[in-house]
């Protein structure tokens, strides 16, 4: 990233006043190491250490940065996660770039002139002398050290170890690290786009670990996410090929949006009347309705991209968690090219049949069963079948 582009990126991303990271991480600035540069001054910067430590506003900021970088990418300037990390570092730390890099200086002396962002616009009005006193440099070599990934080896003499850094934002793209498992939108209020009154409706998002999800709600959400992913990937390919008309692109984009809205309508519950199975009493509260993926989908059409991305982060994190919790259920099977892959309906039907046979449950009972209990039962059956197969092979 060129210095001019870098400054433009940081200045174009405004930081909400209420966004503040959650954990302190003291960083040593160059002028602390060399008192000749400036008088010694300690500055404690706060950066989140994981996805789950990010507030909803911070997750949306990450999404906006990623979406902007994706839009700016082209054949000669591919998407680079390092640019995302640089922007996130300055925004999370509450640092504003006052002056860019002077490329005429030696590389080790090139730096950004920065200052800490103030909580209100009124406090930003200072005299030139005050501005000069509160500015500080961040050198390129410092930024490179802070954002270069940590080593994956303990060999201190290896090239990887010698080239490693502090890796302060490794969690942004570290597949082996902690994933987002906290749903970013516990509650959501949306306006009904249909009808004359256009009333707002309150929705409740998934609880921790999707507690309360039935097997049917989980399967619907999983299948709709698979459908969305397939349609979205096809849309990207269609745009890259350049052989489709604008009408065809628009039609595919509408299909993607429809699949996304149906997924959101499935995981967000609204207040409805239902019979509490524990008390057998009629209750009006947030509850799952088997038809909500269809009836509520129009309300979730054209859902903002910067809010959709955190939900994608969460779903990815949940699937990673479940795959580790139930490894046999989520085990990747080798594909047989002679056989056609199973459809979601076939998988759903096979699961119902298995539960009916081995657990003695009806289809409705399986659908209303907690998704985690069904996965536990399937995990146990899959493990037993694998052990039996290993015995037969011996």
Give the residues covered by each predicted segment.
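An amphipathic, hydrophobic-aromatic interaction surface with interspersed Lys/Arg
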Residues: 3-394
């Amino acid at each position: 990233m060129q210095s001019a582009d870098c400054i433009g990126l940081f200045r174009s991303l405004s930081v909400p006043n209420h966004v503040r990271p959650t954990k302190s991480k003291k960083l040593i600035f160059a002028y602390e190491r060399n008192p000749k540069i400036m008088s010694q001054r300690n500055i404690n910067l706060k950066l989140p250490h994981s996805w789950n430590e990010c507030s909803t506003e911070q997750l949306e900021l990450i999404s906006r940065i990623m979406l902007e970088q994706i839009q700016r990418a082209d054949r000669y300037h591919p998407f680079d996660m390092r640019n995302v990390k640089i922007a996130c570092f300055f925004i999370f730390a509450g640092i504003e770039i006052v002056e860019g890099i002077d490329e005429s200086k030696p590389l080790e002396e090139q730096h950004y002139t920065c200052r800490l962002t103030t909580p209100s616009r009124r406090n930003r009005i200072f005299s030139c002398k005050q501005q000069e006193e509160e500015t500080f440099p961040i050198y390129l070599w410092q930024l490179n050290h802070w954002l270069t990934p940590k080593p994956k080896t303990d060999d201190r003499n290896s090239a990887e170890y010698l080239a490693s850094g502090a890796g302060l934002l490794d969690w942004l793209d570290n597949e082996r690290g902690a994933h987002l498992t906290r749903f970013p939108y516990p509650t959501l209020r949306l306006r009904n786009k249909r009808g004359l009154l256009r009333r707002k409706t309150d929705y409740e998002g998934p609880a921790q670990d999707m507690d309360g999800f039935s097997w049917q709600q989980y399967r619907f959400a999983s299948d709709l996410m698979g459908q969305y992913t397939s349609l979205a990937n096809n849309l990207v390919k269609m745009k890259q090929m350049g052989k489709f008309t604008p009408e065809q692109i628009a039609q595919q984009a509408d299909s993607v949006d429809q699949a996304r809205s149906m997924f959101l309508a499935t995981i967000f519950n609204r207040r409805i009347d239902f019979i509490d199975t524990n008390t057998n009493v009629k209750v009006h509260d947030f509850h799952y309705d088997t038809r909500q993926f269809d009836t509520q989908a129009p309300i979730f059409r054209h859902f903002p991209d910067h809010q959709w991305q955190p939900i994608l982060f969460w779903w990815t994190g949940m699937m990673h968690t479940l795959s580790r919790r139930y490894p046999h259920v989520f085990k990747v099977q080798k594909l047989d090219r002679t056989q056609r892959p199973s459809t979601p309906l076939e998988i759903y039907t096979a699961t119902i049949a298995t539960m009916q046979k081995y657990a003695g449950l009806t289809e409705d009972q399986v659908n209303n069963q907690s998704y985690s209990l069904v996965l536990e039962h399937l995990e146990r059956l899959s493990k037993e079948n694998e052990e039996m197969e290993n015995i037969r092979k011996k």
